[in-house]
């Protein structure tokens, strides 16, 4: 019986450690880019479940599954030659660093969010663009006034089932964690 209690306690504490070991980095970068840290946490949970070395099906890397193209855009925008060099010579290494990955992922999220700022479905549209690309969001809203769509109406219009599930899952987790405080 004691071994069961010890094992359960260990599993609980490991689980808590695993899910929250990047909280400080997430909070730091979320503040810089004015994104709710619980949203960034929820996005990382969905993307990789906090596996910093994760590689996606089409070459996305790290916690926030950032593409090499996005990393190179970020490096160019920073104007720092060291980041440009690293993004060209070892982009996987750059994106496998949790701090850089979260920084670049938050930068990209904010860049996408600029397109949808102030809309009722701002967060859902930004998440959909993060997952499937902004051109898909435009496609899903082309025959309506996108500035007036509610979040639920937009999610219903998402034409890729996996993206619809991705957006819904992140929003649900985000709202659950935001309610806990």
Model-derived features with residue positions:
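Export/targeting segments at the very N-terminus of extracytoplasmic proteins
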Residues: 5-52, 57, 75, 99-102, ...
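Sec-exported extracytoplasmic/periplasmic mature domains
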Residues: 31, 45-49, 68-79, 106-118, ...
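Alpha-helical scaffolds flanking conserved acidic
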Residues: 36-42, 120-128
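Conserved catalytic or metal-liganding residues and their short signature motifs at active sites
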Residues: 55, 60, 131
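Substrate-binding/active-site groove segments that recognize
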Residues: 58-86, 104-107, 149
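Pocket-lining segment of extracytoplasmic ligand-binding domains
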Residues: 88, 92-98, 109, 113-114
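Amphipathic, non-transmembrane alpha-helical secondary structure
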Residues: 99, 103-106, 110, 124, ...
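Catalytic and substrate-binding regions of cell-wall glycan-acting enzymes that process beta-1,4-linked
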Residues: 124-181
């Amino acid at each position: 019986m004691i071994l069961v209690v010890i094992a359960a306690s260990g599993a609980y504490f490991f689980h808590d450690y695993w899910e929250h070991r990047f909280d400080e980095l997430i909070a730091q970068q979320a503040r810089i880019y004015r994104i709710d840290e619980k949203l960034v946490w929820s996005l990382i949970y969905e993307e990789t479940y906090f596996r910093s070395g994760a590689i996606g099906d089409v070459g996305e890397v790290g916690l926030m599954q950032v593409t090499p193209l996005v990393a190179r855009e970020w490096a160019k925008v920073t104007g720092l030659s060291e980041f440009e060099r690293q993004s060209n010579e070892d982009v996987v290494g750059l994106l496998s660093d949790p701090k850089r990955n979260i920084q670049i992922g938050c930068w990209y999220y904010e860049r996408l969010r600029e397109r949808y700022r102030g809309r009722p479905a701002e967060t859902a549209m930004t998440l959909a663009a993060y997952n499937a690309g902004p051109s898909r969001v435009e496609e899903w809203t082309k025959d309506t006034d996108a500035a007036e769509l509610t979040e639920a109406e937009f999610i219903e219009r998402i034409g890729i089932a996996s993206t619809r599930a991705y957006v819904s899952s992140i929003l649900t987790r985000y709202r659950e964690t935001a309610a806990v405080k």
